[in-house]
Amino acid sequence: MKKSVKQEQVTQMHDKLLRAKAVFLADFRGMNVDKATTLRNELRSASVEYKVFKNTLFDIAAKETEAACLAPYLAGPTAVAISYDDPVGAAKVLSKFAKDSKGVFVLKAGVLSGKVIDVNQIQALADLPSREVLIAKMLGSMQAPATNFVGVLAALPGSLVRALDAIRAKKEGN
């Protein structure tokens, strides 16, 4: 491969890493084309870019990005999954695929918000509810006090009416 082509690839990868919210590395040793295609399609549907990239070129491209801390994990055949939107969605797809592939596809590490995350942390990230579910839960918990307050306000006139009715009934009974 010509040096100019390599430089162009490094520049493109560097730009992608700068835009990434999360980057994951995986060992794909022994994975056949059908499985790789399946994984690419699943990742694409989760807005994740999956690429096999030469380790030395990735190391150069990662300099001055949050992914620079992944250098120790660049050994053997390495695939890169770059998430631009939802790191949880990417972690879910990668973790499920790693579990289903039984050792053919193995997660190495990732970087999220500038911090290296290991396989266990990637799995913990995958176990989180989706972004939409978390937002719905947060909105529900924010809305609950207002709903309770409205319920109390609605109950006050009813309580007053019942108290007045009880007083009226008591006076009529005397």
UniProtKB/Swiss-Prot annotation:
InterPro entries: Ribosomal_uL10, Ribosomal_uL10-like_sf, Ribosomal_uL10_bac, Ribosomal_uL10_bac_type, Ribosomal_uL10_CS_bac. The keyword Signal does not apply. Gene3D superfamilies: 3.30.70.1730, 6.10.250.290. GO terms for cellular component: large ribosomal subunit. CDD domains: Ribosomal_L10. This is Large ribosomal subunit protein uL10. Forms part of the ribosomal stalk, playing a central role in the interaction of the ribosome with GTP-bound translation factors. One of its GO terms (biological process) is translation. The lineage of its organism: Bacteria, Pseudomonadati, Thermodesulfobacteriota, Desulfuromonadia, Geobacterales. Part of the ribosomal stalk of the 50S ribosomal subunit. The N-terminus interacts with L11 and the large rRNA to form the base of the stalk. The C-terminus forms an elongated spine to which L12 dimers bind in a sequential fashion forming a multimeric L10(L12)X complex. One of its GO terms (molecular function) is structural constituent of ribosome. Keywords: Ribonucleoprotein, Ribosomal protein, RNA-binding, rRNA-binding. PROSITE patterns: RIBOSOMAL_L10. The keyword Cell membrane does not apply.
